[in-house]
């Protein structure tokens, strides 16, 4: 929009919040989507608020809130504080300085979509607003407009079929197993082997092990029989070392076999297949040959090759199965938002404050698909 600052793009994740100005390749700010309040304050005292990494570091002294859980906003007041923090402390901008594009999960409840628009227009005072599905933006970032996006972050894993930029909601599948669950599972596996990393502060260490040492086995049963000489030595922050082996492929296996974390649901291979089979017959081959990975929990080495193998077993004979694993998939949702909000052809898509005032919050259902 002319006369304004470049649009702000906010990717609202269960684990991390990513924010920055459209037109840049990476978000300028990425930090945990958590809010901390000082304990023991009274109604008359000024309450100390910490967000992101600062809240993580001081969490033993704070009451911690997670504004987004399982992909959905669970505390609207805290979410608004996080959004205001982005403008006031990260970007040093007034919300009225320019448009904002906010991401949302597939199947976001209608009431939540309306509420988000109300907060940005009525409370923050943005001049223009748009909301876009995370999977659609990840697909755009990969250079496609049609494909099946497997998006897995901290809170949820979703399979989303997209045709020419439009989410086919009848084919969306969701699994409530994602990064946070895998971290908890790895803590349990380590405990079973006598490696006690169970304190709240240890979670960061276990997350680091998960992100830098875990991998997906091509064949889970075969991997179980391999020699322990495949052990990895991991150095803990206190200088002690631990030997890791089977935990490293046990952990991400829960994405393929959710029963490992006590969730009765199909794994990601069956999710992808089921999602595709919900779609029109003429579109299925396009989806089988364009499965796009997105989100940090799809970054395990070997996940893409294992997914090809397992989906191919389920697919009709002679079906070409291709999985595309963009190297930047941890931030691809935000990147897609940055690209979209910068396109000259997109500028007529913004919902303006005047339009919102005239039509009301229902306008998001008419304009944001």
UniProtKB/Swiss-Prot annotation:
Coiled coil: none annotated. Testis specific (at protein level). Expressed specifically in haploid germ cells. It is found in: Cytoplasm, Cytoskeleton; Cytoplasm; Nucleus. InterPro entries: Actin, ATPase_NBD. CDD domains: ASKHA_NBD_actin_Arp-T1-3 (cd13397). GO terms for cellular component: cytoplasm; cytoskeleton; male germ cell nucleus. Keywords: Cytoplasm, Cytoskeleton, Nucleus. Pfam families: Actin. Belongs to the actin family. Interacts with PFN3. This is Actin-related protein T3.
